[in-house]
Amino acid sequence: MANHKSSLKRIRQEETRRLHNRYYGKTMRNAVRKLRATTDKKEAVAMYPGITKMLDKLAKTNVIHKNKANNLKSKLALYINKLA
């Protein structure tokens, strides 16, 4: 167990950040799954900007790597273009 006040505070902060990152990571994964499950192109096109915004924010705050965000955006764009 930590002995210093600052290390106790650090432990509290890390736990808060971990829960925050888990929540937004899970939310992002669910949004991507929902888009991939969509077969309607209009609906997918409407969802895409919100998901890209979410991916960019998570990459900026280091919840996910920036390359992962870019790869997901690229693959989702390809998926949307393939929809008829």
Swiss-Prot record:
> Keywords, A to Z?
Ribonucleoprotein, Ribosomal protein, RNA-binding, rRNA-binding
Q: Which GO terms describe its cellular component?
A: cytosol; small ribosomal subunit
UniProt GO BP: translation
Which residue ranges run through the membrane?
A: none
Q: List the Gene Ontology MF annotations in alphabetical order.
A: small ribosomal subunit rRNA binding; structural constituent of ribosome
In its keyword annotation, does this UniProt entry include Lipoprotein?
Answer: no
* SUPFAM superfamilies, sorted: Ribosomal protein S20
Q: Which family does it belong to?
A: Belongs to the bacterial ribosomal protein bS20 family.
Role: Binds directly to 16S ribosomal RNA.
Report what the protein is called: Small ribosomal subunit protein bS20
In its UniProt entry, the species of origin is given as Bacteroides thetaiotaomicron (strain ATCC 29148 / DSM 2079 / JCM 5827 / CCUG 10774 / NCTC 10582 / VPI-5482 / E50)
Lineage runs: Bacteria, Pseudomonadati, Bacteroidota, Bacteroidia, Bacteroidales
